[in-house]
Curated annotation (Swiss-Prot):
PANTHER family: ATP-DEPENDENT CLP PROTEASE ATP-BINDING SUBUNIT CLPX-LIKE, MITOCHONDRIAL, ATP-DEPENDENT CLP PROTEASE ATP-BINDING SUBUNIT CLPX-LIKE, MITOCHONDRIAL-RELATED. Residues 3-56 form the ClpX-type ZB domain. ATP-dependent specificity component of the Clp protease. It directs the protease to specific substrates. Can perform chaperone functions in the absence of ClpP. It comes from Burkholderia ambifaria (strain MC40-6). ATP binds at residues 122-129. The gene is clpX. Keywords: ATP-binding, Chaperone, Metal-binding, Nucleotide-binding, Zinc. One of its GO terms (biological process) is cell division. Belongs to the ClpX chaperone family. One of its GO terms (cellular component) is HslUV protease complex. Component of the ClpX-ClpP complex. Forms a hexameric ring that, in the presence of ATP, binds to fourteen ClpP subunits assembled into a disk-like structure with a central cavity, resembling the structure of eukaryotic proteasomes. Zn(2+) binds at residues 15, 18, 37, 40. GO terms for molecular function: ATP binding; ATP hydrolysis activity; ATP-dependent protein folding chaperone; protein dimerization activity; unfolded protein binding; zinc ion binding. This is ATP-dependent Clp protease ATP-binding subunit ClpX.
Length: 423
């Protein structure tokens, strides 16, 4: 753009892109016979960021960036204790899924099908944590849905397409990103068919939801209201293709081991058959023998089982595993409480006997790893309440008696030790 003269005869410079003068913008940068203002630079950066984000969906999952199954397993090991076989199965399944996505555009005679995952294991065994860790590792959108809140479309409750709406919300409504995300559907066992016999009453939260989930899991164009609104006629919908979304379904499947045991005991008959007694086989060992027919008998419809070809079973966590969970993972509970107390400039010591008592209590409550935090929180409540107002406390010691409710934390002052709550 040609230079123009101002009324005071000074030579004004103008942006070659938007035409604004040097007085209308904060900064004007000169190039060979051209100028660009700071506003145009910001606009260019915004365009580049948007294009890079769209391209990043492809680039982030390219072969060079995709971790190998062993690398995925190593990262899972940092957050999840035990469940070695389940971690190996998940690592291979997730690697193959995103490797498949990379080759979607390539024309080939062999079309690779999606392999969704079914996790079977007791409460607190690490099902949800495994799915969360995978999503964080791969840097893809992730959402957890509770199957018990879902109903068929037209009934009170959430319909299955709400799951995709939440996934979109998690990635700021970037459809390309959402279409390569991970959905974890928890409590899938709670929507099992109520009985083998068809009923005249509609099973809107059982088999009906399974039928509704079927299309979503297999791959369909889901219609989602924009920006989290409710569905109503004459409204534009966001179309999301679920074909390449990885679905991981999880559930405790209480009673499934009995179905498996009944089947295996019937087949384990005759000379040379080795049949272990029920006492010799723990639930985890029994669940490893899960077959599609067992899941059908439990109440899942055959079509849904067919869409969940990868089955990983998780065992019940024993005392040793729970103690490791308390101290070993990157974000272990004991490390978290150490940090909380360090913020008060106080050292926290949880003795091995206390860790063992926490693990024993979680096993008695049948809450698995999920119940560990509430046990520690309960034991530390009084001292965390009193500590901010106390002066001179340098250390807090927690032993087995504190966890069992038979004692109080020992407070070490800069001069003498004292028991919490005593004056």
């Amino acid at each position: 753009m040609a230079d123009k003269k101002g009324s005071n005869s000074e030579k004004l410079l103008y942006c070659s892109f938007c035409g604004k003068s040097q007085h209308e913008v904060k900064k004007l940068i000169a190039g060979p016979s051209v100028f660009i203002c700071d506003e145009c630079i910001d606009l260019c950066n915004e365009i580049i960021r948007d294009e890079a984000a769209a391209a990043g969906v492809e680039a982030s999952l390219s072969r060079s960036d995709l971790p190998s199954p062993q690398e995925i397993r190593d990262i899972l090991d940092q957050y999840v204790i035990g469940q070695e076989r389940a971690k190996k199965i998940l690592a291979v399944a997730v690697y193959n899924h995103y490797k498949r996505l990379k080759h979607l555009d390539k024309k080939d005679d062999v079309e690779l099908s999606k392999s969704n995952i079914l996790l079977i294991g007791p409460t607190g065994s690490g099902k949800t944590l495994l799915a969360q860790t995978l999503a964080r590792l791969l840097n893809v959108p992730f959402v957890i849905a509770d199957a018990t809140t879902l109903t068929e479309a037209g009934y009170v409750g959430e319909d299955v397409e709400n799951i995709i709406q939440k996934l979109l919300q998690n990635c700021n409504y970037e459809v390309d990103k959402a279409q390569r995300g991970i959905v974890y559907i928890d409590e899938i066992d709670k929507i099992s068919r109520k009985s083998d016999n068809p009923s005249i009453t509609r099973d809107v939260s059982g088999e009906g939801v399974q039928q509704a989930l079927l299309k979503l899991v297999e791959g369909t164009m889901a219609s989602v209201p924009p920006q989290g609104g409710r569905k109503h006629p004459n409204q534009d919908f966001i179309q999301v293709d679920t074909t390449n979304i990885l679905f991981i379904c999880g559930g405790a499947f209480d009673g499934l081991e009995k179905v498996i045991t009944d089947r295996t005991e019937k087949t384990g008959i005759g000379f040379g058959a080795t049949v272990k007694s029920k006492q010799e086989r723990d639930a985890g060992e029994v669940l490893r023998e899960t077959e599609p027919e067992d899941l059908i008998k439990f109440g899942l419809i055959p079509e849904l089982i067919g869409r969940l070809p990868v089955v990983a079973t998780l065992g019940k966590l024993d005392e040793a595993a729970l103690m490791k969970i308390l101290v070993e993972p990157k974000n272990a509970l004991v490390k978290q409480y150490h940090k909380l107390f360090a913020m008060e400039r106080v050292e926290l010591e949880i003795r091995p006997g206390a860790l063992q008592a926490v693990a024993r209590k979680a096993i008695r409550r049948k809450t698995g790893a999920r119940g560990l935090r509430s046990i520690i929180e309960q034991a530390l409540l009084d001292v965390m309440y009193e500590l901010p107002a106390m002066k001179g406390v340098s250390k807090v010691i927690i032993d087995e008696n504190v966890i069992d409710g038979d004692g109080k934390p020992l407070l070490i002052y800069e001069d003498t030790p004292k028991v919490a709550g005593s004056n």
